């Protein structure tokens, strides 16, 4: 059989035309030899056709029963015709759980397509994606005028009516705990401020609350406890609340660049005399153990202890820092001893 085109020789010595399918008589011989029981490798050597070509022809014949080659030359004809596309959309609308290969089988069963002219699975999936995109675009166009249109106030609208949250923003409702839930959470907090995951799970099961809600409650409760402790500490030390925020150029702070004799004594603030109760609070000692050379003139200089992050008070050479007591002589900074009355408070073991 003479064919137009440039012929070539394969590895077995057979002639073929590049880009052209095998002749129909060769295909019939391949099928007849396979029906007689000859193996594909023996058919390939006998007819001098590549083993891959024999396998593809036999596989297509067993699968579809078609022996003729597919269309040659030009592009592949469109198998997804408008009628087929409409039926695919109808099947997917009626049975959303259908797979593409099930739709393909249904098209062949109904007779809309033959077995060799049915659209492939990838083509059906492509059609379904296009239909879904068109549908989503349609709904977007329907919603867009209502969203983009400006909201004009009505002359009969009530201006004093409360406004709800914006439709586009998410609003989280505040969790309201029952008395039993609040009591159980508070008992667990008194037992430990940082419960582990097991304790949180048990508490969530006991209070019928989500574990995330329990975790957030403990976080908020710890923050509330810190605020309460800070207020309690400031109430015990009335002068400490003013010393928490120290300005940059505070008259009570002596910078490192200043010489010892250049700081005037008026720059130091004058506070209240040292009371026995304050000495007992800071030192942890009895009032009788706090000795003073000048009992009527005991003055303190407030400053900030960076290690304990608590404002403490110092006398002439004493620093009231908790839990340890360290001494820093202040008379060296103000030009020598004797200018500030010495007040000594020792830490008893």
UniProtKB/Swiss-Prot annotation:
Keywords: Developmental protein, Differentiation, DNA-binding, Homeobox, Nucleus, Paired box, Repressor, Transcription, Transcription regulation. Residues 8-64 are annotated as: PAI subdomain. Plays an important role in the differentiation and development of pancreatic islet beta cells. Transcriptional repressor that competes with PAX6 in binding to a common element in the glucagon, insulin and somatostatin promoters. InterPro entries: HD, Homeobox_CS, Homeodomain-like_sf, PAIRED_DNA-bd_dom, Paired_dom, PAX_fam, WH-like_DNA-bd_sf. Belongs to the paired homeobox family. It comes from Mus musculus (Mouse). The keyword Repressor applies. Expressed in early pancreas. Later restricted to beta cells. Undetectable in adult islets. Residues 83-131 are annotated as: RED subdomain. One of its GO terms (cellular component) is nucleus. One of its GO terms (molecular function) is RNA polymerase II cis-regulatory region sequence-specific DNA binding. Residues 5-131, 170-229 bind DNA. PROSITE patterns: HOMEOBOX_1, HOMEOBOX_2, PAIRED_1, PAIRED_2. It is found in: Nucleus. Residues 278-349 are annotated as: Transcription repression. GO terms for biological process: animal organ morphogenesis; circadian rhythm; negative regulation of apoptotic process; negative regulation of transcription by RNA polymerase II; positive regulation of epithelial cell differentiation; regulation of cell differentiation; regulation of DNA-templated transcription; response to cAMP. It comes from the Eukaryota. This is Paired box protein Pax-4. The gene is Pax4. The keyword Ribonucleoprotein does not apply.
